[in-house]
Design a protein with these regions (language model features):
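RNA-interacting cores
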Residues: 1-198
Length: 198
């Protein structure tokens, strides 16, 4: 099963800063199979935070979904949709992109079900070990997100020293809970060169 990213152009003046669950709900309403797709992930949106607690998306902002190839092709039908989120999120054209085997990958927010950093790292290490992946990691900033079930807490996490196969595996499977609301999705760390690129 090959996992890929789908990148959509988006237009939206403003979003609530804590938008993760609302974005998932809007996407699930537009893609009737998303809720039942266990391996699906929704990347965090990148924008500029304002003092009033909103998030502004620039012209380069992209809505990114991590999906199996089969679902990726079906997700392209999302183009042209207007999602009821913030001031209204208009979805433009989508492109399917292969995952890149970088030796270092980073997730903005990994949720392992605990707020204590030492316990967080222990749980992350156990999950990596169970998946046969190396436990070379560095935790970063603490994060929190509101959901109907309560507040989720976690940390950013960097994994390093990965082989090409390990890099693709952890990007495909993710780590922790909440992939559909933006947690545990790893992307290449931009300060390093893709493994095997040269």
């Amino acid at each position: 099963m090959t996992v890929v990213d789908v990148s959509f152009e988006v237009r939206c003046e403003r979003l609530p800063r804590d938008y993760g669950y609302a974005l998932y709900e809007a996407l699930a309403g537009a893609l009737d199979w998303l809720e039942d797709e266990a391996s699906a992930g929704v990347h965090p949106l990148h924008g500029t935070a304002a003092a009033d607690g909103e998030l502004f998306l620039g012209r380069r902002a992209r809505l990114m979904l991590r999906l199996t190839e089969e679902r990726a092709e079906r997700s392209l039908a999302l183009a042209g949709a207007r999602l009821a989120l913030g001031s209204g999120l208009e979805v433009g054209a989508g492109k399917v992109r292969a995952l890149m085997p970088y030796a270092t990958v980073h997730s903005h927010f990994v949720n392992t079900g605990c707020a204590d950093e030492a316990e967080f790292l222990a749980r992350a290490a156990a999950e990596l070990r169970e998946a046969g992946l190396p436990e070379r990691m560095i935790s970063g900033k603490a994060h929190a997100m509101s959901t109907p079930e309560g507040e989720l807490r976690g940390f950013s996490l960097l994994l390093h020293g990965l082989s090409p196969a390990q890099s693709l595996a952890v990007q495909a499977r993710g780590l922790g809970q909440g992939r559909k609301i933006g947690c545990g999705i790893f992307v290449p760390h931009k300060s390093v060169v893709a493994v095997g690129a040269d």
